[in-house]
């Protein structure tokens, strides 16, 4: 069972905001609630033999939501923004790779997913799979992956909490990510560049300029004739044109 599924089970069992599950490598797992200790063997440092590009560290955090359902699709964007802002405070080479991966220069170093559910209120489980070496350095935790999981989960909770306050102050609903869109724009390095729209099969559908992102999270591509093409995350990915 993956950490996201474990966290979902915890949430359905009444787990509260901030409870999390994390795993290091494919076989080591650790569940934690707040500051609870885990066994030393389950939280061992990542092996130096792990190859570049793999993301053997994963943490899934339960967040009880205080927003209405139309806002829920924004959660992974909110977390991506919060994590990226934190990372960019130390190094501006970090960015958001649409829709909500974290990149360092041209390399994706963290992937974010969110799964919503309802049990004693609306909740989301936010899972982050990442290169632990990059995050350990950014969060200044050496090779302590348990502490890293705790700090990442705290940042997830903080990011969602700040956004929820924005939602509560908003006078009307303008789209799930409308309230963070301006800040989100600033984190996406591919905006304005030539990109390929790539289907899940790997086929390139078109090459166009990455013109923007709408309030629903769609990428807006602009072709050579000035026509705007909306791309959803389910339909295709957007990558730099070669």
Language-model segments: residues:
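Conserved catalytic/binding loops enriched for acidic/polar residues
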Residues: 1-43
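Long, positively charged amphipathic alpha-helical accessory segments at protein N-termini or as interdomain linkers
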Residues: 2-16, 65-94, 104-242
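Generic preference for hydrophobic/aromatic residues in regular secondary structure cores
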Residues: 20-32, 46-49, 139-141, 237-239
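Ordered hydrophobic segments in well-structured contexts
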Residues: 23, 60-62, 123-125
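Pocket-edge structural micro-motifs
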Residues: 26, 61, 223
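DPxDG-like acidic metal-binding loop motif
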Residues: 39-69, 75-79
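Short Gly/Ser/Thr- and Asp/Glu-enriched loop/turn motifs at secondary-structure junctions
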Residues: 97-100
């Amino acid at each position: 069972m993956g950490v996201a599924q474990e966290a979902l089970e915890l949430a359905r069992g009444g787990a509260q905001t901030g409870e999390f599950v994390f795993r290091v490598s494919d076989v080591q797992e650790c569940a934690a609630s707040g500051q609870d200790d885990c066994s030393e063997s389950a939280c061992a440092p990542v092996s130096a033999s792990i190859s570049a590009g793999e993301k053997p560290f994963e943490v899934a955090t339960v967040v009880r939501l205080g927003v209405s359902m139309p806002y829920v699709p924004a959660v992974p964007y909110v977390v991506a923004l919060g994590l990226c802002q934190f990372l960019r405070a130390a190094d501006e080479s970090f960015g958001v790779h649409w829709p909500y991966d974290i990149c360092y220069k041209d390399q994706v170093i963290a992937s974010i997913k969110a799964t919503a559910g309802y049990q004693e209120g609306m909740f989301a489980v936010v899972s982050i799979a990442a290169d632990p070496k990059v995050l350990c350095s950014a969060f200044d935790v050496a090779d302590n992956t348990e502490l890293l999981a705790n700090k990442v989960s705290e940042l997830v909770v903080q990011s969602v909490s700040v956004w929820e306050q924005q939602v509560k102050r908003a006078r009307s609903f303008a789209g799930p990510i409308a309230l963070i869109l301006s800040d989100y724009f600033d984190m996406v390095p591919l905006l304005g560049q030539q990109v390929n729209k790539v289907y899940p099969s790997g086929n390139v559908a078109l090459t166009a300029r990455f013109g923007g992102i709408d309030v629903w999270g769609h990428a807006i591509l602009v072709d050579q004739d000035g026509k705007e093409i909306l791309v959803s995350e389910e339909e295709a990915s957007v990558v730099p044109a070669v």
